[in-house]
């Protein structure tokens, strides 16, 4: 034993190790016992271009937010990690970030990697969400190992989302945080999760256009441009015209001002920030519990039948698949009375998930500081769940965070679709539409227009006024492909409605009557 200690900690051994460490440092290498690269010169070369973040994790070069929508970003594990855990995280802008972590990494380790990658400061409002084998969504617990929480994987797929919707968006200090909130709300509205009235939807869509495109310039921008964006499900042409008219009223707003106006408008929606959970009552009927910053909403179908404010809830407990709420209410004489409500869920796992979400919402929005008091009872005889809220509250997030002097980020453009005129033109002209999609707009996502089964996709329509139509003559070199000289596209000079009659007649002939097409210089008639 003494021989081992002298060999390891003796003066000569320490001097020899110091000389070796100095040589490795000059060569840009490191000892794996110190967290240096493993695998020889190749590993050292690959890690030399990746600056290490605090904690020994390796991040992409640059360190700041790499908002490359739709791209894939890889974050390597630290050099000392032998076994790695592979996780895929999808950000709000569409970026997929793959992270390698140690085998026994906790949720906090993965969350720290993501917020460091994004250069996000106000992290308390966000979380990582995943689906279990029963397709039930769960929030990743930062205090527990990832492998113990996620049973589907590897690779483990998670989504970076807003977990706590701020009750007052003006308290969000950073512009980047407000931008992420806008992305989350746009996704909620487009997916149908967040319902909003018609007028509110028009205003929110107009603010999105102002933030992304800037001023509405009438010669350049038309109502047809609005149809290239998607704001709500089942978007109509009449709504797009109203959005365009409202867009013109927001002249002068910067992107940051437009996004703040968006949040201040969206916060008044009835279902803003509501986390819905399906339960069953004592009568066996299905209800929905909505967790909000002010309390718990009760829905029967689409009708709101009750609201339990957080200060009125004195007890919230669960046992197996049964959730119990004790609420204090004033009777007609002003005396307080306790009412007990019992709800049942499909399984004990979903019941505990609802209870945890309710505890987290109550602690985040109602408390100034989380209660860290430990029970006097021994852990050996302790009953119930060990879960305790360990994050920061909204009060701490708004009063304790320090504002940065400067921060820069990139706003990603929205997904664009062909305009309505383009889609209508494509339905009647398959060849020209294919040329438009491949040449004029290579990155525009295609519609699925109404298709006529009796017309070959590569065969252009033959028109009476143009007997020799070919693939080459449809799109000439001296003018864009979208220009068309057919008579029914031109406005009638008389203005007596003959133009409309001609269009109806041509459409009827094309759909029901006989027409001719040319294919490889051969005239074919299809009945």
Swiss-Prot record:
GO cellular component, one term: cytoplasm
Keywords: Cell junction, Cytoplasm, Phosphoprotein, Tight junction
Signal peptide as annotated in the record: none
Domain of life according to the entry: Eukaryota
Effect in UniProt of substituting residue 385 to A: Abolishes in vitro phosphorylation
Ranges where the record places region Disordered: 23-47, 400-425, 453-482
Domain FERM, first and last residues per copy: 85-369
Main location: cytoplasm
Listed GO biological process terms: actomyosin structure organization
Biased composition (Basic residues): 413-424
Expression sites (tissue/organ): Expressed in mouse liver cells, with lower amounts in lung, kidney and in 7- to 17-day embryos. Expression not detected in adult mouse heart, brain, spleen, skeletal muscle or testis.
GO molecular function, a single term: cytoskeletal protein binding
Post-translational modification: May be negatively regulated by phosphorylation.
Polar residues bias locations: 467-476
UniProt-annotated location(s): Cytoplasm; Cell junction, Tight junction
Subunit note: Interacts (via FERM domain) with ARHGEF18 (via C-terminus); the interaction activates ARHGEF18.
Protein name, entry field: Band 4.1-like protein 4B
Organism whose genome encodes this protein: Mus musculus
């Amino acid at each position: 034993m003494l021989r081992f200690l002298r060999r390891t900690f003796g003066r000569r051994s320490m001097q020899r190790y110091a000389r070796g460490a100095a040589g490795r440092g000059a060569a840009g290498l490191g000892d794996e016992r110190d967290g240096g690269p493993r695998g020889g010169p190749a590993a050292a070369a690959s890690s030399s271009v990746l600056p290490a973040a605090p904690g020994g994790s390796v991040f992409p070069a640059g360190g700041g937010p790499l908002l490359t929508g739709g791209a894939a970003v890889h974050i390597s594990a630290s050099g000392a990690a032998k076994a790695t855990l592979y996780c895929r995280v999808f950000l709000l802008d569409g970026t997929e970030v793959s992270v390698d972590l140690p085998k026994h990494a906790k949720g906090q380790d993965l969350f720290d990697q993501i917020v460091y990658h994004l250069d996000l400061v106000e992290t308390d409002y966000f979380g990582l969400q995943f689906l279990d084998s029963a397709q039930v969504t769960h929030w990743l617990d930062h205090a527990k190992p990832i492998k113990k929480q996620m049973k589907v994987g590897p690779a483990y797929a998670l989504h970076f989302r807003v977990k706590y919707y701020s009750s007052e968006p003006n308290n969000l200090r950073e512009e980047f945080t407000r931008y992420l909130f806008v992305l989350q709300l746009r996704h909620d509205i487009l997916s149908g999760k967040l319902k909003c009235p018609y007028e509110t939807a028009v205003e929110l869509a107009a603010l999105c256009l102002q933030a992304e495109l800037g001023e509405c310039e009438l010669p350049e921008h038309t109502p047809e441009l609005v149809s290239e964006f998607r704001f709500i499900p089942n978007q109509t042409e009449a709504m797009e015209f109203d959005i365009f008219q409202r867009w013109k009223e927001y002249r002068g707003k910067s992107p940051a001002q437009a996004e703040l106006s968006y949040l201040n408008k969206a916060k008044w929606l009835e279902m803003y920030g509501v986390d819905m959970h399906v339960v069953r009552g004592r009568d066996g009927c299905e209800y929905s519990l909505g967790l909000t910053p002010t309390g718990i909403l009760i829905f029967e179908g689409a009708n709101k039948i009750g609201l339990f404010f957080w200060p009125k809830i004195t007890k919230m407990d669960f046992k197996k698949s049964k959730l119990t709420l004790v609420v204090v209410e004033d009777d007609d004489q002003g005396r307080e009375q306790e009412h007990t409500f019992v709800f049942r869920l499909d399984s004990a796992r979903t019941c505990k998930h609802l209870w945890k979400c309710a505890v987290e919402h109550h602690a985040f929005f109602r408390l100034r500081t989380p209660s860290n008091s430990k029970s006097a009872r021994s852990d050996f005889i302790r009953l119930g769940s060990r879960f305790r809220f360990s994050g920061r509250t909204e009060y701490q997030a708004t009063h304790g965070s320090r504002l940065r002097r400067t921060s820069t980020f990139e706003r990603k453009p929205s997904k664009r679709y062909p305009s309505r005129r383009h889609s209508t033109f494509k339905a009647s002209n398959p060849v020209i539409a294919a040329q438009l999609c491949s040449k004029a707009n290579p990155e525009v996502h295609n519609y699925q227009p109404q298709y006529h089964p009796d017309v070959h996709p590569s065969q252009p329509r033959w028109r009476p006024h143009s007997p020799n139509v070919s693939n080459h003559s449809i799109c000439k070199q001296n003018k864009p492909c979208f220009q068309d000289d057919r008579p029914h596209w031109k406005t009638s000079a008389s203005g007596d409605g003959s133009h409309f009659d001609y269009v109806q007649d041509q459409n009827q002939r094309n759909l029901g009557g006989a027409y001719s097409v040319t294919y490889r210089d051969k005239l074919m008639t299809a009945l």
